[in-house]
């Protein structure tokens, strides 16, 4: 065929097809769901195009999906009257250009994900090879001729100008040449069951071409005539009777005839137009799966209508788990399908729902929006803003309903707590409502998640604030020296160990009148009695000179050295400034590949070195300073090691780990009575080098 061109599959698509062909996955019926879903998308596109171009439907006015099983030739055909594909579309979409989801799906499959997830990655077409050895795609676009794409998945495909086949007028027909062990999908019952299970709520008619054998009564005229002719010569002449008796004697017989007809499989009207009380759990589950291509049931559903000045209906679903690409920049910002008076408009409308609710899936059908909506109109439309506000409120209602069931809420929180915290960071209007949904482990509840409301209820009467600590992990914060005083006072402290917590608490300043206080920052004022205050002031005076000496040794590494009332057992710790980054935030920002380094210089807080006067180590070091002075080499080494150890225990990282290791090695040598001269000389840390090393940090002082 001179009009045939051969192309090679892009490497990733070849690998994907090989994975599908060789899979031992038993639930192969999902191929039909994927192909029907693609057909529905193609119909959505032509219907949307027809809103601005009335002639788009001229070639074929009816919009439908038709399934035709051909048992004789072992071919299953799925046809739609959608937008169709041009020659270039067939080449690019079905073989040459790999979609971003191709690689993601293969990675997910390699790590044990269910193959029925294929539709979520935009590569559902290739599921056809679960049941077919060869696939043909015949397509006719309004702007091009009719072409046939064909491949047996051997690494290449052909595209041919179709001059001989039946005319499609417009749309696409996929012909699956079925594998010998998959012929059950040519059976009427199997097709009906599969469509009901996966695609019952598709918005377009799904027709099944069925063959029926019907019995028909026909007169035995022909047979009688033949017998008559044969015996005409032999038989004697019989006297003719009148017409009436002749009619009585005429006989009929029953013959079987094969007829072909189309049967509509999805007559159920759109589920969102029905009264919520009439819809069963099974129907919601079926609709959710057909809408999202998920193989699991949803976690929660909210089905409602809004009437009055503005009218719309909606169904919103919370999935059981977060998609793998939930926070990827290129991902669609939401999963809500927007309809206007049952006409599909778009499923990529960023204005419909905020980004932090990007995991919500569902349908919104408005009575008031114009049908010919452009992206610009969507952005500026006041109705959209009202719909958005309503959707957010209903989502919050749904989350509160989930929270009533502890087990369900744990599933929800494990999957979507980051979204709630992103909402707290971005959505000022709903911040108080979102804060009620937050859950944390804490000092007094290390194994249970508690809410902020729970925390306040259990607060002692004299406690004024909500205390929290941020860190890399629960284990890291549980052993933090910052908690020592809180254990002693029996105050609870929330453990915030998700990196996004740092961003959320910068916006969530208080909850129900109680201020949220980070215990790793300076300026922490703990409630104390007059006696405790007098004892603290006495110790501050006693250690004032020692604190000055330590500041001299550490130089610009710290802003100040103070006597602490926060430490019970540890010798010292480091706190950060009120308005700069915490140790945990500093760690997070250092891990950002595209961070603004100039910002780091200002936001990396000046550190306060807090010493515990009741610690034997601090008391002994104070004596050593008084005896030998601040210039003594061992005093400098000990002070620096204390500082670096405090850095680590307070959640910071060391700028020069090798120098720290050398100092520790020197201490080990002393402990083992190894002669110092046997050791390689260790360069002393001068206050000048410390100043140079921390020049960037000093900028913070200028800003303050």
Swiss-Prot record:
Compartments, as annotated in UniProt: Cytoplasm
Annotated Acidic residues bias: 218-233
Signal peptide: none
Region Disordered, annotated ranges: 213-262, 678-704
GO cellular component: cytosol; mitochondrion; perinuclear region of cytoplasm; plasma membrane; protein aggregate center; protein-containing complex
UniProt keyword terms in alphabetical order: ATP-binding, Chaperone, Cytoplasm, Nucleotide-binding, Phosphoprotein
Regions of compositional bias (Basic and acidic residues) in chain numbering: 234-262
UniProt xrefs under InterPro entries: HATPase_C_sf, Heat_shock_protein_90_CS, HSP90_C, Hsp90_fam, Hsp90_N, Ribosomal_Su5_D2-typ_SF
Keyword Cytoplasm tagged: yes
Gene3D superfamilies in the record: 3.30.230.80, 3.40.50.11260, Heat shock protein 90, C-terminal domain, Histidine kinase-like ATPase, C-terminal domain
CDD domains: HATPase_Hsp90-like
Family in the record: Belongs to the heat shock protein 90 family.
Free-text comment about domains: The TPR repeat-binding motif mediates interaction with TPR repeat-containing proteins.
Subunit structure: Homodimer.
Function in brief: Molecular chaperone that promotes the maturation, structural maintenance and proper regulation of specific target proteins involved for instance in cell cycle control and signal transduction. Undergoes a functional cycle that is linked to its ATPase activity. This cycle probably induces conformational changes in the client proteins, thereby causing their activation. Interacts dynamically with various co-chaperones that modulate its substrate recognition, ATPase cycle and chaperone function. Interacts with the wee1 protein kinase; which requires swo1 for its activation.
NCBIfam families, per the entry: PRK05218.1
Name by which UniProt lists this protein: Heat shock protein 90 homolog
